[in-house]
Swiss-Prot record:
Belongs to the RNase H family. Gene3D superfamilies: Ribonuclease H-like superfamily/Ribonuclease H. This is Ribonuclease H. Keywords: Cytoplasm, Endonuclease, Hydrolase, Magnesium, Metal-binding, Nuclease. Residues 6-147 form the RNase H type-1 domain. Its EC number is 3.1.26.4.
Amino acid sequence: MGIFTKKNNVIAYTDGACKGNPGIGGWGAILSYNGVDKEISGAEKDTTNNRMELMAAIKTLQALKRKCDITIYTDSKYLQNGINQWLANWKANGWKTAAKKEVKNKDLWQELDSLTTKHNVTWSWVKGHSGNQGNEKADELANKAIAELTGK
């Protein structure tokens, strides 16, 4: 039985981590569907914590084999606010912020925006490092990916 089970709905916890900002970063996610858990992770040499948070969400949605109802839990206010509050305005403003500056990480925001149209996504914020089992596992996966990349 999966640790995060809700019948016929994918539950995912995502997290990004960075050693230095910018620096070596990793992302991790755990997806659960009908009692089966799947762990995914990856790392990059020169990145930021926000890029890794976005990558975790992107890779989570890319891992889905067909259109799904999915709830994604993140501890990133950047991701949560971006997807729920800022994205529509960025798109309407030609991918510029309210201050008329280029949106940071535009490439990843555009990819995430495209992927969210293929699924029924609910975004939920969870406090990081507060003992939440899913968030702790995603954080562990992100940091393990960094360790594997650096050989430490």
